[in-house]
């Protein structure tokens, strides 16, 4: 546990999110750690200790938040393309993760304007 290293990782992750790097199709943990100028082990430890989840889960949640926004902002673009724009490389995984995290399908999310509980 190194507080200075964790602070550095936190700052690098903030920039990574601002730049929407989470939308890049799956890279290895080694590649991402390298981009963040840290080791794979330090990145794993940061997520386990600070975030209380693994990196892939966190990245998936960022992608789902992005897709929720895109589904409402851009109603002309197909749901499959929205999934790709948010960083999902395959349609089935996008739908599965969306339903798991949001509790409804991307189509239901879009049709309800982001309020799936208020179905008309």
Locations of regions flagged by a protein language model:
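Membrane-proximal linker segments that couple transmembrane helices to downstream signaling/catalytic modules
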Residues: 1-77, 81, 99, 115-120
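Sequence-specific DNA-binding recognition helix
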Residues: 74-110
């Amino acid at each position: 546990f190194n507080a200075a290293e964790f602070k550095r990782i936190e700052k690098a992750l903030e920039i990574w999110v601002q730049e929407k790097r989470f939308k890049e199709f799956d890279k290895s943990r080694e590649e991402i750690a390298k981009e963040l100028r840290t080791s794979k082990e330090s990145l794993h430890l940061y997520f386990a200790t600070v975030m209380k989840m693994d990196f892939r889960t966190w990245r998936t949640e960022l992608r789902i938040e992005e897709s929720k926004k895109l589904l409402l902002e851009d109603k002309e673009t197909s749901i499959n393309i929205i999934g790709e724009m948010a960083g999902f490389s395959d349609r089935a995984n996008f739908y599965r993760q969306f339903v798991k995290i949001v509790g409804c399908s991307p189509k239901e999310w879009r049709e309800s304007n982001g309020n799936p509980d208020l179905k008309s």
